[in-house]
Amino acid sequence: DLDPDDLSEKIRAHLDAHGYGDIGIEVLMNVTSSTLSVQDPLAKAGIRVLEDWGIEPVIWPRKGASGPPGYFSTLLGLNVLSSTGIGHATGHGSPDEFLVIEGDGKVGGLIELEQSYVDLLYSYANYPNEY
């Protein structure tokens, strides 16, 4: 649960303590991280969709980067489920971001990704009942 402002201050203090006061720090953006309990209804709805698709969920409680999930979670006060869906993509907001467009039966593509999002909306709207 790192606070971006607190972290910036700690980095500044560390640099100063080691004789690097001449190094400037320019914060371009600071976004808090987000986390969601696997017991949260949104997470359970997402897990249910993956299992219904025959996919064993891989759960990462935290990601190694900040980004839109943390921003919108803080801004709107909502729980955010990130990096979910059928298909393969990674690197959101980075120069090497990608998304598989056409699945090959082993890896889902854009159509499967979109359908899994629709399933997630239905699953969450009806949770804990069947969707």
Predicted regions and their residues:
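Short amphipathic alpha-helices in soluble, non-transmembrane regions
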Residues: L7-L15
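A short beta-alpha structural unit
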Residues: I23-Q39, R62-G64
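Short, low-order "capping/linker" segments at domain edges
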Residues: S34-D52
